[in-house]
Amino acid sequence: MQSSYPETYAYLLAHYDRLVPKCVSRDGTRDVPNATADTWYQYGRTQALTAFINTPKLIVGVLSKEPMYAMDTNDILIASGGTAGYCAVSKKDGSPYALEYIQAWLSNPITERILEIVGSDFEGGFTARGTFVLSTLPFVELDFAVEEQKAIHDRVVAASREIYEINDALSGRPAKRIANLLQRQKETLISEIQGLIDRVYRLDY
């Protein structure tokens, strides 16, 4: 660490008293069973740290007030466990559903209402939406052999990708007039996606 990432090491060293584990120092406060005197800065959690390497995924904020399902294609490392941190959703092998569609399904207000009912409630209006809760969610399957149903899926995916492009454009801080136009386009697309998922919930193909 010190030779490969000297500035990171210097930052960690500046906070040594807060980071040193109990097993390394009597003054330590962290429980990191595998840490040594040489790896005192070691991260405490190991759950799912390598489960989604080189895998596009949705990063889910486990404990949140609003839906948070961020598309990640940059191999961001996440820590998970219980109702802390984040969990991830990836595409199953052989699944016909794009991650963009799953993201739209999870973000839909109907899905969110179900999560509020079945998820654990925490003080301050927070709802836990971890892997166990997500695995129990109802999911209306589409018949991809039926043109109208496949068209709904494909349009949700296309509209989602348009939103990603708009977000990229907005991150470049365009002129206010352009930003307002892009924001309106984004809101229109979000409304369209929500309407399409609402139709699937109603079996209105």
Where are these regions (language model features)?
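Non-catalytic DNA-recognition/assembly elements of restriction-modification systems
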Residues: 139-205
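Polybasic, glycine- and aromatic-enriched phosphate-binding surface used to engage nucleic acids
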Residues: 1-151
